[in-house]
């Protein structure tokens, strides 16, 4: 008699599919145990780690026996009719703990990694077109049913390192997809994914930088500029910081690409680059004449204000032109 296939999903809420039905573990600890074994993707999880995840620093004396009961319940959920104490096919005793016997066909996390790794391999060898890389990465990202692995579990469980590490795999793949789409000249292929990711985590600067660049490349120049302004305000309000170098560079790229590059401040010329380090050297007191530091700092502030004003005017012209052109097709 053929065994019924079982599929596990953790890229979003934890799900199990068997024979067209979706049996749900009844107890929160059973769901947490199944999720922990799934995010470890076929690797054994020691009993001590399971105890720590389920109870933290104050486990009951009966913790190991409770885990064994949870394992038995999960085994019968996955394989109805399984005799008591039988190991079954999926939840295996292994290396002083337990292992979920899964592969890329039965677990969405492993399937995501398989497709993502194939895309990265093709991108690294340079022989495949960027468009193919984009297609594979968007296929992999499409397996996620939300921004977080094992969504719905208690936060104290999801804060564990194994869950957080898997959470980081999604934005990393999305950054790769955005970069490949920009190289391929197909920004629209990832735009909705980037918009959703920015809504899920509005302070993720690397993703915001790619959203700004992708919006502009897709013809949404005004939205790219307004996205940067909103991000800058949010970072200041929520974190008390200015945009980092990557996000600032993305914004500057959009302004330059608009054809209205900010002009150099008055007096700046071929020698401006050579003097760029002067304020820092003057403040450090290395080789500067007395009083030179004040003059250098004043000159630097004047230059910064001039550049900021010129960039603001260039940005306004870029936004006006984008709005006049109307939305991209």
For each of these PLM feature ranges, what is it?
Residues 16, 30-37, 50, 67-81, ...:
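DNA major-groove recognition helices of helix-turn-helix
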Residues 10-31:
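A structural micro-motif at secondary-structure boundaries
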Residues 16, 40-66:
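Positively charged, aromatic-enriched patches within helix-turn-helix-type DNA-binding elements
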Residues 1-11:
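Generic start-of-chain signal for non-secretory N-termini
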Residues 2, 23-24, 28, 39-42, ...:
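Intrinsically disordered, charged and Pro/Gly-enriched terminal/linker segments
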Residues 267-277, 285-287, 291-295, 309, ...:
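Residue-identity detector for glycine
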């Amino acid at each position: 008699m053929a065994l019924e296939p079982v599929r596990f999903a953790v890229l979003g809420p934890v799900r199990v599919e068997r024979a067209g039905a979706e049996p749900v573990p009844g107890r929160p600890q059973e769901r947490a145990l199944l999720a922990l074994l799934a995010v470890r993707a076929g690797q054994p999880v020691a009993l001590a780690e399971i105890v720590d995840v389920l109870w933290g620093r104050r486990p009951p004396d009966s913790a190991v026996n409770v885990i064994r009961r949870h394992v038995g319940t999960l085994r019968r959920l996955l394989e109805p009719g399984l005799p008591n104490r039988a190991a079954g096919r999926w939840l295996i005793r292994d290396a002083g703990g337990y292992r979920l016997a899964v592969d890329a066909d039965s677990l969405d996390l492993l399937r995501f990694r398989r497709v993502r790794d194939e895309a990265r391999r093709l991108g690294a060898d340079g022989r495949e077109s960027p468009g193919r890389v984009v297609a594979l990465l968007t296929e992999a990202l499409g397996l996620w049913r939300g921004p977080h692995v094992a969504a719905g579990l208690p936060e104290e469980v999801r804060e564990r390192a194994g869950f957080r590490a898997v959470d980081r795999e999604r934005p990393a793949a999305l950054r790769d997809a955005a970069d490949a789409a920009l190289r391929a000249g197909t920004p629209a292929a990832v735009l909705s994914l980037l918009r959703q990711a920015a809504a899920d985590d509005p302070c993720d600067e690397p993703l915001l930088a790619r959203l700004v660049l992708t919006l502009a490349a897709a013809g949404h120049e005004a939205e790219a500029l307004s996205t940067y302004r909103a991000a800058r305000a949010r970072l200041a309000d929520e974190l008390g910081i200015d945009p980092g170098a990557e996000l600032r560079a993305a914004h500057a790229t959009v302004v330059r690409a608009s054809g209205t590059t900010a002009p150099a401040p008055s007096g700046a010329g071929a020698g401006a680059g050579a003097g760029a380090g002067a304020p820092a050297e003057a403040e450090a007191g290395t080789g500067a004449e007395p009083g030179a530091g004040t003059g250098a700092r004043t000159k630097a502030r004047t230059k910064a204000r001039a550049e900021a004003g010129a960039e603001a005017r260039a940005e306004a012209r870029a936004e006006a032109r984008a709005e006049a052109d109307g939305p991209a097709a």
